[in-house]
Amino acid sequence: TPGTVLEDRQLDGERNHFLLALELDKKGARASWLDLSTGKFALSQTERPYDFLSILNSLSPKEILVPEGFDDHLTSLDLGSIFKDELERVLGEITITERPGFDFDQRSGAREVMENLGVMNLEGFGIDLGHPALGPAGAVLVYAQDVLRGKPGNLRRIEEYRDGEALLLDPATQRNLEVFRTS
């Protein structure tokens, strides 16, 4: 699949090749992303879904995993037309793969992450076992294992991308300044 490519000739040496899992509701956005070629593995949550658009745009994932019924769920959320339009613009360029909702379960995700990293807890990475984005982290790992028919062998750590620790530029600004891509 686009997010699980490992062939050298299909990878761009200049950019990461992220597979991202996304969960979105009125409480905010939760996501996790993984580059199987480098082992980079991270998660994040934001209370304002619009802030996540900046993260999503800067990561430029090759594939996004969403819970089944994501389109209907997105329609039912009252997040505003500007957000929905911008999300559709960003997602329009990316392969979207629906996964069963239980793949995004937070407790199962925590177990999956610990098992893949070979640890008993996530405190050494600064991540609480109750972190809401562990659901998407588990979904990314389960999907990668399904496609690869085994565990990714190069995962050593998981990092938390914290909202507020970096300057966030909205997608329109990123586009106009050509920060990540040139036209």
Which positions does each model-derived feature cover?
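Charged catalytic and DNA/RNA-contacting regions of genome-maintenance
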Residues: T1-S183
